[in-house]
């Protein structure tokens, strides 16, 4: 089946980062019930709450599941500026997003 005893290990090493990324993303979707954090439509992507070009990281508490429409509309705008102007804005969802991002800060110093 394999040409050498090391080949299965090489395949595992190649697959591990991809699988880890998939599981990482899946956990975030699961925590948000696969719904957009902004409008609660089905989520199809992850948005950087603090955009990458504004020093936003790709850690789990800076990533928010969102629908394509919200991700494209927000683009690289700061979440606080963009979200409050949306017709679907709710303070409850804003509080949930803010709480999510603060968990990341707590995790850093725990």
Please provide the spans of the model-predicted regions.
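Short, charged surface segments at domain edges that flank catalytic/cofactor-binding sites
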Residues: 1-33, 91-109
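Active-site/pore-lining binding-face segments in mid-to-C-terminal subdomains
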Residues: 68
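Histidine-centered nuclease catalytic patch
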Residues: 35-65, 74-84
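Generic anion/oxyanion-binding catalytic loop in active/binding sites
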Residues: 25, 52, 71
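A detector for short metal-coordination/catalytic motifs
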Residues: 61-62, 72-110
């Amino acid at each position: 089946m394999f040409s050498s005893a090391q080949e299965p290990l090489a395949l595992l090493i190649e697959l591990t980062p991809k699988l880890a990324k998939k599981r990482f993303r899946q956990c975030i979707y699961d925590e948000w019930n696969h719904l957009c954090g902004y409008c609660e439509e089905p989520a199809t992507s992850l948005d950087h709450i603090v955009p990458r070009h504004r020093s936003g990281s790709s850690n789990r508490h800076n990533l928010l599941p969102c629908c394509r429409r919200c991700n494209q509309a927000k683009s690289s705008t700061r979440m606080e500026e963009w979200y409050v102007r949306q017709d679907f804005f709710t303070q409850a969802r804003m509080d949930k997003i803010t709480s999510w991002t603060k968990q990341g800060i707590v995790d850093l110093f725990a």
